[in-house]
């Protein structure tokens, strides 16, 4: 019995961070679909959504003299530290990542960088290139944060092309994209286990 328990894969906590605060966000829809895929078909992987809407805009005047942070920021930093890996839903604004996401990245990097040495994956949905340019800019930011992104597979969803990919509430309705999300998650799981083993 003990051998069976020790050989089982540990349950990895995937912190899902959506860069859009919009209720019916397509990027939020990708993350919700990821949570469902994990529950249905990926043992050992659990997606937990992180809400970044309560974070104040980065202002170092809000930090205390002893290096403390506002309560919402402290709670967020605790969540980042406790995660095994991250799945980011990154919309694209002006060829870059959205302000709420950059704000979250910056707060958790203040003082002791909470992102360091954590594995991550990015998915995105939008017009044009499906958010692809935001992903590449995000990867540049990740270099300084010491985030370790999986390289493949990539997922850029062209949200406005037919047939519809999302319903009016922002939920993913496309089976092919759902399968591609599964492949991203499997890659993230394998990469995370490899990094933790090292």
Specify the residue positions occupied by each region the protein language model found.
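Glycine-rich phosphate/pyrophosphate-binding loop and the adjoining helix
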Residues: 2-10, 148-198
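A generic structural motif
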Residues: 40-48, 148
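Cofactor-binding loop segments of dinucleotide-utilizing enzymes, especially the Rossmann-like FAD-
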Residues: 19, 52, 125-127
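N-terminal beta-loop-helix "entrance" segment that forms/cooperates
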Residues: 49-69, 163-165
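Helix-loop-strand module that forms the ligand-binding subsite of alpha/beta enzymes
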Residues: 66-146
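A general structural signal for well-ordered alpha-helical segments in protein cores
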Residues: 14, 27, 31, 73, ...
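N-terminal beta1-alpha1 ligand-phosphate binding loop
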Residues: 5-43
């Amino acid at each position: 019995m003990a051998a069976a328990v020790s050989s089982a894969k540990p349950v990895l906590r995937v912190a899902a961070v959506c860069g859009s605060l919009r209720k019916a966000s397509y990027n939020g829809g990708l993350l919700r679909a990821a949570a469902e895929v994990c529950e249905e078909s990926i043992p050992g992987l659990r997606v937990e959504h992180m809400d970044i809407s309560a974070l104040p805009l980065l202002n170092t005047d809000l930090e205390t003299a002893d290096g403390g942070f506002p309560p919402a920021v402290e709670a967020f930093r605790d969540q980042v530290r406790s995660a095994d890996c991250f799945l980011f839903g990154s919309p694209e604004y002006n060829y870059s990542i959205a302000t709420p996401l950059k704000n979250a990245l910056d707060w958790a990097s203040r003082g002791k960088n909470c992102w360091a040495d954590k594995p991550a994956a990015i998915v995105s949905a939008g017009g044009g290139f499906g958010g692809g340019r935001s992903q590449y800019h995000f990867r540049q930011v990740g270099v300084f944060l010491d985030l370790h992104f999986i390289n493949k597979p990539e997922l850029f969803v062209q949200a406005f092309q037919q047939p519809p990919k999302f319903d009016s509430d922002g939920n993913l309705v496309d089976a092919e994209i759902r399968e591609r999300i599964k492949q991203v998650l499997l890659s993230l799981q394998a990469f995370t286990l490899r990094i933790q083993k090292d």
